[in-house]
């Protein structure tokens, strides 16, 4: 099924393809950036994400190795998606940006050990 992923102001919008049973892999990450964002990441394939609005206002944030790509809306500041360093062919999406997913209802969200995957520790 196709779901709409939108930032808070609605100026960045993407279509994400997820199975009928829902996002199969989701997690929190404890790397220095993700723990500060505090969001839940849904993992989808590279062919399951299509940006449909806001390409010009979408901003890129990179740090350390500059391999991972973290995207956010330059108007409202909401992080919408990323391309992780460990596998740049997949997308990590902010599942709170999909209106009909209740992130507060998710129980036992696993934690990815991104802190120990980083090359530099703060």
Language model features: what each stretch is:
Residues 1-120:
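A short Gly-Trp-Pro
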């Amino acid at each position: 099924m196709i779901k709409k992923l939108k930032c808070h102001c609605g100026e960045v919008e993407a279509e994400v393809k997820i199975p009928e049973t829902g996002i199969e892999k989701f997690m929190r990450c404890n790397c220095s950036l993700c723990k500060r964002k505090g969001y839940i990441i849904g993992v989808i394939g590279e062919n399951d994400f299509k940006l449909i609005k806001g390409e010009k206002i979408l901003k890129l944030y990179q740090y350390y190795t500059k391999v991972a790509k973290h995207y956010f809306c330059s108007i409202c500041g909401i992080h919408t998606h990323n391309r992780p360093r460990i596998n740049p062919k997949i997308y990590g999406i902010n599942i709170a940006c999909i209106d009909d997913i209740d992130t507060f209802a998710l129980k036992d969200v696993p934690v990815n050990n991104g802190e120990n995957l980083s090359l530099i520790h703060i």
